Each structure stands twice: as structure tokens, then as C-alpha cells.
């Protein structure tokens, strides 16, 4: 059976489940695995037994951190699911999984509607143009409102929802759904506690009118999408179920509309029809545009690959995980071709040969060995030495580099000091392994204190990384307080700065002269730095020019005000001079570094701080206190709105002012308000704050 599917890509779906942190995403995934026969016991996030939450910490905290890839079968179709985390500190995991998906199920909380994090994940899915269906979950919850949630999909996401189901009852009385395509009711009765079976009945009388109204809206949308159906519809003819499904599929695959279904995963209602919708409406690998890449080293030479086993092999590594027995597991999405276990391929991103070891299809953290990998599927590979997230693996004779992924810089750091010499060695191993898995995890040595400093996307992200060092790698260490990852930049242009590096003390000397210009710069793709060479007539020999560039980049690691990394600048090498005997790569590297430092001091240097987009949801009574508190934290209020009886305040607030915020917010609102925050941008700090930061950093 599985082998037949491998050859028929029409029957394959590569999907993700995406949502806000508590919308019930992991529970929904668990139910899918249960109904597709992979799981024999339903795992519950509440009791820490979920299949996809397979790291110890995920089970303790009840949140999904790493996206496990799970394969299951439904009605002769194969579904590969990537479970993505919903907590904002793990957006990199979400980006990574969206890159390799063909479609997604967006899960919403039926009471809360579209929440800040669901909005952010939705925007990321827009970026990768991923077709989606929407599942309004938790319909059994007090205050659940399907129609409100559909409205928030329109209002907050600016998306076009296509309602294809209506709920029967809500809260305690939620018992099933009205299917607007087949015009029947699917009801889960109390007899099958686990919801494996449901009854197909007539639509309840009290819903008949509403069902007819929504059915009409659905048919109009369907007819508008296809001229032949439009003629038929206005000619008074009935559209067949297949015609309706075909039109919905076309609209979904083209991201013109998003089918909306509902249910309660926790109460085992509505999951099977959602699985049917995954098959009916989300794209197979054949429906997605051919993957695009370029010739290694030649970005303007574009190559396309079809999702076919006959094409040359090309795959993207999208996740690294450390497995307790096998060591490093690399998750890959194969876009074209097929290749056997043991085959030699090339990592075209790094230009290095790799041999594919054992190949698996994964079921959370259980493995199913396979003899080969083939286009359109997701696998885990053992034995890749140099491959990291975002690298392309391909046929050595037909090389291609697929588009890579860009990851944000860390915004928060902590120092970590091993307790003993043996801990120091373990820390080295832990850092290397964790950095392989997570491109948003950064490591550096503080030159003043000699301490190791690690950086990440938020407090929870760093907590979990430190926790993993202690648990998985048995590192005993003292961890400092979280610190903000400030940056430095320049505000003025320095048109000409001359620097000569000269050392002549017996033996061979050192000589290098450079003249540079320095100006503020931000690249289109968010790049922080650019180097341009304008030297003519060999006044600086060609072989020394990369050294000037390297020196400038080295100097950017430690800024001129408080030692924070310098960003957003362009260096132009205008002129220079060299000496036949005393010039060297090292001399020009030193000259490049010193010239950059001197120019930066004259270019109006300033300190930048990470600004967070904060959203507070509070009862009306505490609105004044919440706004006053945000203002006292240097917050800029961006918007205020009403949401399901509460008030929502949106603000931009410096990260440095947000430490310990949850405690203050709870005491001000008697525990009734909550908040979420995501990194927004870097902004210049006010002069008085800048003075404090510099004084603290320089110890003055």
C-alpha cells in the first residue's frame, strides 16, 4: 500500500498544522494519528503524553518546540505532517516547516478567534504562499463562537473564508457539524467515546434556514470561480458534489479562498471530516509550482525541477534533530528525483560531498526504515556530516542550489559559566549540537570577561536551550541574568578616511594603507553590511582586497560605543598603497579593521535596541492602568480595540523594559489580563538611555 502511494504523488499531502500557542494544535495532530490508525492510545498534551511533543521539556511544558515529521495514511492517501510550534520564540521552526510544506491546516481557538500568534504564523504562510484550510477548534469550550471566529479571519487576516461546515450546538451541546457541500449533518453520539464513528443524518430543523443561507453563499463563490459552473448555476441547474469540491480545491490551491471547518479535537468531534478536507482541498506535490533554484555560484542562472522521480535528485534539509540512538538526524524534503540509501550526493550550498546513511520515514520519534528517497516526500537521514538547515542536497552531475532560508538575529542573551573543567568540555559539545539544530541560537565569547554568551529569540527559547544543556548533555553551569542584545549603527556618511598600518622593527615589517568611505546601509533582503571596491590601477593589489573586507567585518563584531555589534553600514574601499616587501594579507586586514573603527567614531554612532510588538488583552476596568504602565516602560501605543468583551492594547515597547512584565501585569489586573509579544524591529535608543547603556558596558 505505502509503496503504491510512493509512485502516485496525487495521493500525497505534505501539510503542517499551524496555530496560536493554546489553540489545540498538538491535540489535533494526536487525533489525526489516532484516527489514521498510527496511535492506539490517544496522547493528551495535558498529561504530557503526546506523540509529536517528544522532547522531555515539551512534555513538561505542554507546548510544541520542535517540529516532528509524522507520516500517516487516510483513505488510501499518504499524509506527511509537520507539527509546528505555536510559541513566538520558535518562529524559526515555523518558517522552516512552512518552507517545505505544500499546504497547511490553520487551527483557531473557537472562543478567541484569530490571536496575535495565529496572525503572525498566517503572515509567514503568506510569505511562502502555502494554501490553507481553517479548523475552528474548541467548539465545546465555554464562550465558543464559530461565526465570530470566521469574522476575525476576514477582519484580522484580510483573508477570504469559505464556510463549508456549520457547528451543531456549541459549548456543552456541541455534537457535530452541518456539511454544506453534501448538505447533511455529521453527528458524534456518546456511544463511541473516542469518536471513531459518527452518524450521517438530516440537517436539524432549527439549522435548516441558516444552512440554506450559507450553502447559497458557498455556491455563489464556487460558481464565480469557474465560467462553466457560473452558466450552470444561473441556468438553475444543480451543481454536483464533485463540481463543488473541484472548484473549492482550485480556489484553495491558488490561495484565493480558505475553506473553514469546525470541531473539538479534545472531545473527538470533527477530525475525520477535516482529514477528508485535507485530501479533497489541499495540494499534492504535483499541484505545486516546480521548485526553483540556481546554478551554484551563479544566482542569475535559474533552474526549475519537476516533482518527478525521473528528474535529477534535489532535496532541501529543513531541520536537524539529535536522536538519542542515531545521533544527528537531518530532515529533508525531496523535490525531484530519487536516490538509494548509501548513495553519494553533493551539498551544493557548501560544495561538499555527503553520503546518505540510513533513510527513514518518521512517526514522531519512531522510525520506519526505507530503501530509497523519492520526489514529493519528507524523510529523515542519518550520516550527513556537513549539512545544516537550509542546505541543498543534489545529484553531483546536475547541481542546483534551492532558495535558502533567512533567519532573524537573536534579541536576548545570557552568560553561561561551566562549574568544572569537565563541564567546560561538555558545554562545548552541547553548544555545537544545539547550534546545528537551531540557526537562531548564537554563541560568542565575551572578550572582557572570557564568559560564553548564548543568544536566542526570547526568554522561553533560552530557558529551554539551557535546560537541554543540563538534561541532554549533563552540563552543570551558572547562568547569568538575561541581557538585551543591543546593536550599534551609524547615522552619518564619512566620505574619506585614511589609515596606515605600519610596523618596522627589525626583520620583515608590516605596511598597509587604505582610504575608505563609510555610509549607513540596509539591504533589500535585510542584509546588515556591504563592501564595494573602487580601487583602480592596482594601488592595492587584488589579493589584498578581501583582507580589507574581512578586517572591516571583524571590527563590526565590537562597536565603538559600548562594544555591541555594528550593523547597517556600507564600506567602500577608495584607494590605498602597499609595499613590495612589507605588505601582507594580515597587514591589510588590520588596516581595514582600524579604518572602520575610526570612521565609525566619526559617523554619528548610536545604539539600537530591539522593540517588541506587545499585545495586552485586559478587562475594561484595568485599561487605564495597563496603558499607564506601558507608557512608563517607554511604550508607544499603536492601537486599541475590542475583542470578545475585553479590550486589546497594541504597543511597541523596548525589550529591555519587558523583563518581569507578566508579574506586574497580573498584580495590576488581579491576574485577569494576559499578553503576547513578538520581535518587531531595532530602533535607536534615546540619549539618556544610551548614556546608561554605555556607562554599564564600559564600567564608567
Swiss-Prot record:
Where is GTP bound in this sequence? 19-26, 83-87, 137-140
Please name one Pfam family that this protein belongs to: GTP_EFTU_D2
Q: Does the keyword Oxidoreductase apply?
A: no
- Tell me which residues make up the tr-type G domain: 10-286
Q: Where in the cell is it found?
A: Cytoplasm
Q: Which UniProt keywords apply?
A: Cytoplasm, Elongation factor, GTP-binding, Nucleotide-binding, Protein biosynthesis
Q: Gene3D superfamilies from the xrefs?
A: 3.30.230.10, 3.30.70.240, Elongation Factor G (Translational Gtpase), domain 3, P-loop containing nucleotide triphosphate hydrolases, Translation factors
CC terms in the record's Gene Ontology section: cytoplasm
Q: What GO terms are given for molecular function?
A: GTP binding; GTPase activity; translation elongation factor activity
Q: What InterPro entries would the database entry show?
A: EFG_II (IPR041095), EFG_III (IPR009022), EFG_III/V (IPR035647), EFG_IV (IPR047872), EFG_V (IPR035649), EFG_V-like (IPR000640), EFTu-like_2 (IPR004161), G_TR_CS (IPR031157)
A biological process from GO = ribosome disassembly
Instruction: Tell me the disulfide pairings in this chain.
Output: none
PROSITE patterns per the UniProt record, alphabetical: G_TR_1, G_TR_2
PANTHER family assigned: RIBOSOME-RELEASING FACTOR 2, MITOCHONDRIAL, TRANSLATION ELONGATION FACTOR G-RELATED
Question: What function does this protein fulfil?
Answer: Catalyzes the GTP-dependent ribosomal translocation step during translation elongation. During this step, the ribosome changes from the pre-translocational (PRE) to the post-translocational (POST) state as the newly formed A-site-bound peptidyl-tRNA and P-site-bound deacylated tRNA move to the P and E sites, respectively. Catalyzes the coordinated movement of the two tRNA molecules, the mRNA and conformational changes in the ribosome.
Please report which protein family the annotation says this sequence is part of. Answer: Belongs to the TRAFAC class translation factor GTPase superfamily. Classic translation factor GTPase family. EF-G/EF-2 subfamily.
Return the protein name.
Answer: Elongation factor G
